[in-house]
Amino acid sequence: MKLRLAEIFTSRMVLQHGKEINIFGTGETNQQVTITIQGQTATTTIINNNWLITLPALEISTDETLIVSTGLETITLSNILIGDVYFLAGQSNIEFKFKDCDSVKVDQEVCYDRYLRYYEVPQIEYEDENIKIPPIRNQGWQICDNQTINDFSAIGYYLAYYLRHDIDIPIGLIAVNKGGTSGSCWINETYLQKNQEIKKVYYDEYYQAIMNQTEAQEDLEIAKYEERVKQYQQKVALYQQTYPERNMSQLKKDVGHTPWPGPRGKKDFCRPAGLYYTMFKKICQYSGKAVIWYQGEEDTKNAYLYHQLLQLVIENWREDMKAQIPFIIVQLPEYDDDKNDNWPILRDAQQQVCREVPACYLVVTMNCGEEFNIHPQNKKTVGHRIFWRIKELFYD
């Protein structure tokens, strides 16, 4: 078995300074693996084809090299920064790309920053020993320039932009998010079953509904859903061609929203605990400064349970990260197209969690929303507010 690093470790990466960091991967059982970086060397034995080395805190620096070797094989990664690493977690509004925000024309041409890096955890929806859906190629860490920035999280970019200009420290952003996801997608079965109401609403009801579903039935439902989405996209394109001056909020009011949710099934990325395994577990041992958690829109239908659900997410992630990592909770903004009038309830739950759970901090985004658009295009203001919260917490 070849020596490998976990996918998140590539040239151009950013490692967290000032705390222990984990380097991990796979290889041949019983071989010795040695790593060297910033003058530090550490060795471990590969057990059951897996290895992990924890290094003492590294100092802020640039242009470092990581060497990983078994003696028979060597991996060398270059152009590594040591700075602060932030996880961008949740659903579509933290995933929302820079190229789609309303400030793209103003800021794109002046965005180049070799000390700002971005890693997107591949959005694997389903995998087993035979298949991976979709078969996404790992892009590795990207340096911020006027091309790569298009696919950065817009909120993440603006947070990093303000940090870089105010604090002048290398910044790494790790996107571990996917649009349309409930908090229940991001925790494991043990945590989903800790609370009986959460278990009933999020876990039992889902899997009971697909208990007798065949793979052929699921594939048929997926095909039907994809056709509905295609027809909707055609309507949107025609509307934008006819009314180019109208904004997205007006479009959503007139045309309606993207067909949602998709069909349930074992390959549905919205299944309980699904993305916990296919995305979060791949990077949970990577050391970082804080988690930016912007999520909740999908859970407004069960807003009365969100207080418990969000607590479970935080507990589960901290357990897996083996750290009391701070959570910066981005509170949902105003939104008028809430048929159940549940958004205020969920906002209250977010605030309550930040009052009760240690090292959880709220960022208020009221007046950043749009009347009928669940994906407001002003991400610069939200990124700036997160920056101010983080600055007062970690840098003042």
Residue ranges and their predicted role:
Residues 1-396:
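Cell-envelope and extracellular/periplasmic
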